[in-house]
UniProtKB/Swiss-Prot annotation:
Gene: BFR2
Gene Ontology cellular-component annotations: nucleolus; small-subunit processome
Species for this entry: Eremothecium gossypii (strain ATCC 10895 / CBS 109.51 / FGSC 9923 / NRRL Y-1056)
Protein known as: Protein BFR2
Keyword Transferase: no
Lineage, opening ranks: Eukaryota, Fungi, Dikarya, Ascomycota, Saccharomycotina
Highest taxon listed in the record's lineage: Eukaryota
């Protein structure tokens, strides 16, 4: 069926500018693509370069040529025959064969003109020159290939060396980082152990506080002991002495082992535990251990104090360098222990007013020589600023109490309070840090939960109110226990209004009688 006029018109109207080709038709694409493509490419390049400005040769090209023409880029001169003997020999054999052939031809054809010979020689020379030029090109190409391969190998070797250096530096950095992390972890663990040891020592001191206070009440002289000692007390005293002897031996053994292990002692001490050693021998051994520990302690404190001061930068300021707080820890300890009599005197203050058993009797009998000598010395000495004559921390009026010095008691309550305050502050700080973390975690969890919103309290369906907190330090007036009567209330308000009310009962009864008589004598009668 043929196309209608409308179809033909629409086909002509919608005909595309670029003709459509069937990709399966092989004859459509059979044309000279090279010629047309080259011409089209030339035209395109000409159009693209039409707006270019004509410029001269670049200076970079001249510099590049100068660099390339440098003497270091030129090769060494040599003869081809020396390098390529094999190729020369092959060329010689071929020329011999050709010469023999030409001789045979001359014998057979003697009448040939000399022009043919000259033409053949020229042809042979041209062929040889072509072969020589080809050999030279191949030689130069092989030399360039070898140079390129050598350069590539050098670049690969340098790249491998750089990668090895980078890998080695990375390993060293990781090793240093791991070592630093391990050192920091060890320092933190050591600090935690020191804190635990400090807390344990203060805990022991807290438990011994009651024992020290009770020990100050024990009798001071032998006569007082014998007068108050019975069989049961003697048995308890003997068991306590054995226990104290055992504890002192264990402490001496532990300290000796520790100081030998840590190389604190200059000469290793051979400790042999024995039950026959007296308390005096154990005390002497502890004194020797203390003397050897003192030097080691000073060196360690000085080393770590210097490191801490160097990292904090306090030593850089010349104005604060010589302050007591900025000096090394061992120097501060030595300065505190320099005035030992003053420190001992502070431990002999009777702060709690302790009176040992039999103290009055011993004092009257003059069995306390230390107390008598101290009282005589105090009479001629001036008042000490650290140990006032009238001192009692429990009393507000210290001038009324004479808390004198007693050399037979031991009371380090001031130092004990300092240690206890440090421990309490540390515990409070740790608790606050933990509570802050818990509060942050709780607030974060509350933010994730759904808000508590009453959806039914809109449009006046609920009355919103808040309970007011009670007023602090306020008390409403309280009645004295009696109330006004009705007559008093009426009289009070009547007086406020300027009226007077009479509360006489007889007058009210007479008024009632008069009213009744007036009703009886009334002329109006309704019922008979």
């Amino acid at each position: 069926m043929g196309k209608t006029l409308a179809d033909q018109i629409t086909e002509l109207a919608n005909k595309s500018k670029v003709p459509d080709f069937d990709i399966e038709d092989e004859q459509v694409f059979e044309h000279d693509s090279n010629a047309s493509g080259s011409e089209a490419s030339d035209e395109d390049e000409a159009l693209q370069a039409a707006h270019y400005v004509q410029v001269g040769r670049s200076k970079l090209r001249n510099k590049h040529n100068v660099l390339v023409e440098d003497s270091k880029y030129s090769g060494s001169k040599g003869s081809r025959e020396a390098l390529f003997n094999s190729s020369g020999e092959e060329d010689g054999s071929e020329s011999d064969r050709r010469g023999s052939d030409s001789d045979g031809g001359s014998d057979s054809d003697s009448d040939a003109p000399e022009a043919t010979l000259s033409s053949e020689q020229s042809a042979d020379e041209s062929a040889r020159s072509d072969s020589d030029s080809g050999d030279s090109d191949s030689d130069s190409g092989s030399d360039a290939g070898e140079e390129n391969s050598a350069v590539a190998e050098d670049a690969d070797a340098k790249r491998e060396r750089l990668s090895q250096l980078v890998r080695l530096e990375t390993q060293q950095a990781m090793g240093k980082l791991n070592a630093a992390v391990q050192n920091d972890a060890l320092k933190g663990y050591a600090i935690m152990e020191q804190s635990r040891f400090f807390e344990g020592a203060i805990d022991v001191r807290i438990k011994l506080q009651k024992a020290i206070a009770a020990a100050n009440q024990l009798p001071l002289t032998k006569q007082s002991w014998e007068s108050r000692l019975d069989a049961q007390d003697a048995e308890l005293l003997e068991s306590t002495c054995k226990l104290l002897h055992k504890v002192a031996g264990k402490c001496a053994e532990l300290r000796t082992t520790f100081q030998n292990k840590e190389r604190i002692n200059q000469t290793e001490i051979d400790y042999q535990p024995s039950k026959k050693r007296s308390i005096d021998a154990l005390a002497e051994q502890c004194h020797d251990l203390d003397s050897q520990l003192r030097d080691y302690r000073g060196a360690v404190l000085h080393m770590w104090s210097s490191k801490v001061a160097a990292t904090s930068g306090k030593t850089a300021l010349s104005s604060s360098k010589f302050k007591a707080i900025n000096q090394p820890a061992n120097v501060q300890v030595d300065n505190q222990l320099a005035d030992m009599p003053r420190l001992v005197k502070r431990t002999q203050l009777n702060r709690r007013g302790v009176v040992p058993l039999g103290f009055e009797e011993d004092y009257k009998q003059k069995r306390l020589p230390l107390l008598d000598s101290n009282s005589a010395q105090d009479g001629g000495q001036e008042e000490d600023a650290d140990v006032p004559a009238n001192y009692d921390p429990r009393k507000k009026d210290n001038n009324a109490i004479d808390a004198s010095e007693n050399p037979y008691i031991f009371d380090d309550e001031d130092f004990y309070r300092v240690l206890l305050n440090d421990l309490v502050d540390k515990k409070i700080l740790n608790a606050q840090q933990g509570s802050n973390v818990q509060v942050a975690i709780k607030a974060r969890s509350q933010n994730k939960l759904k808000k508590n919103v009453d959806t039914k309290a809109s449009k006046g369906r609920k009355l919103n109110y808040s309970v007011q907190e009670p007023i602090a330090n306020y008390e409403a007036p309280i009645n004295g226990g009696f109330k006004w009567s009705d007559e008093q209330i009426d009289e009070f308000f009547a007086g406020l209004l300027g009226q007077r009310v009479n509360f006489d009962e007889r007058e009210t009864s007479e008024a009632k009688d008069n009213e009744e008589e007036a009703i009886e004598h009334d002329d109006l009668r309704i019922f008979g």
